[in-house]
Amino acid sequence: MNIVSNRQEQAFSNPLAMRAASRNGSWTRETSGAALGYVQANLAILPSALADDFLRFCVRNPKACPLVGISEKGSPRIPDLGVDLDIRTDVPRYRVWEDGELAAEPTDISDLWSDDLVVFAIGCSFSFEEALIANGIGLRHVAEGHNVAMYRTNIECVPAGPFSGPMVVSMRPLAPADAIRAVQITSRMPAVHGAPIHIGLPASIGIENLDQPDYGDPTRIMPDEMPVFWACGVTPQAVIQAARPKFAITHAPGCMLVTDKPNAALIAF
């Protein structure tokens, strides 16, 4: 995970500035560390014929696919998520999928937009990571400046139409006392994956080797730590890829939509 530098963090201290930098092409990388205190979202953009099934998939799998916004058909805006927000330009980098294959990674999708597309914004773990760090829980992948480790599991999502497949999880190594606190903190944030779905014993959820993540980068685990697993926003991208729609767009990994919604608004209790 590429952490935004101190100078860049100051420049991108608010969501509008971060989206403007994405829109004008001056920022095309990961958004971790930008606009601290505000919700960042994963994106899935699909033809309207698939929208109802994908919505059902998200509703049936809220841990992996916590919805924070949906656009009207053909609209590149989700007013609840931001002033002057344009889905076509305000994400640093996108992924375009054709028949389940990665076709391009553009920084602007204006020329690909159509009146038939529906946008789904899905909660991102950057929000709960900020809460963990604010409460004194260190995260090694953040400290070391690389992406979080993510794994396919043997936990099957509840299918909907063409969308099905295993849950993808992210892993953060924590000392036992910190793991307990992490459960307490993240359970209050169901809109960004909520509490962990599993702690320890990776083989019991189908993960054979923590040193070989399916996505992201390996993260060292110290002898006094245990792996803590959260449902991950890569899940919807993986099931979209497996469903092989003729056309779909997602965000590129780590390149999120930065919204105007405060993280505090996601705290459920």
Swiss-Prot record:
Gene3D superfamilies: PSTPO5379-like (3.40.1640.10), PSTPO5379-like domain (3.30.2040.10). This is Putative hydro-lyase RL2444. Disulfide bonds: none annotated. Belongs to the D-glutamate cyclase family. It comes from the Bacteria. NCBIfam families: PRK05463.1. The keyword Lyase applies. GO terms for molecular function: lyase activity. It is an enzyme of class 4 (lyase). It holds the Pfam family D-Glu_cyclase. It comes from Rhizobium johnstonii (strain DSM 114642 / LMG 32736 / 3841) (Rhizobium leguminosarum bv. viciae). Keywords: Lyase. Its EC number is 4.2.1.-. SUPFAM superfamilies: PSTPO5379-like.
